[in-house]
Amino acid sequence: MDNPGVIAFPPLIWLVNAVISVLVHLLIRLPIMRYGICLACGIVLIVLAPTLALSALRTMKAAGTNVHPSEPALALVRGGPFRFTRNPMYLALCLLQVALGFFLNDSITLLFVVPLAVIFHYGVILREERYLTAKFGEPYLQYKREVRRWI
């Protein structure tokens, strides 16, 4: 099988996490701060997250590799946002969760970024790293040494 074998499609993982966090928000609310400040933070993140994800998507397409983790990696991508983080798309999805917490002015919703990051780490990222190491060898290991996993 020429793919990393991630546990699920990452945007689906984010969606399930976001829905659960909103359901919890409907039961328990723990405000972060004044709503105006939260709204401003949420707006910044809701612009930043898709911008980061789209930049990563364009960079992967330009490199000629597949984007969906169930398909084989065809190239090692080091340009665009991949110069600063090895996982810009997962970082963007985590930022969306934080944005949701700010929009709802809810600490609990915001803190749902923790289980999301843990699921991404163990269910997606570590699997992708093993796969990319096996597929690309030393060039990928060098990239891992030079660029952080998250930020």
Where are these predicted regions, by residue range?
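Membrane-anchoring alpha-helices and their flanking helix-loop junctions
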Residues: M1-G79, L91-I151
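Extended, alpha-helix-rich binding/interface surfaces that flank or overlap catalytic cores
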Residues: N87
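Solvent-exposed interhelical
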Residues: F82
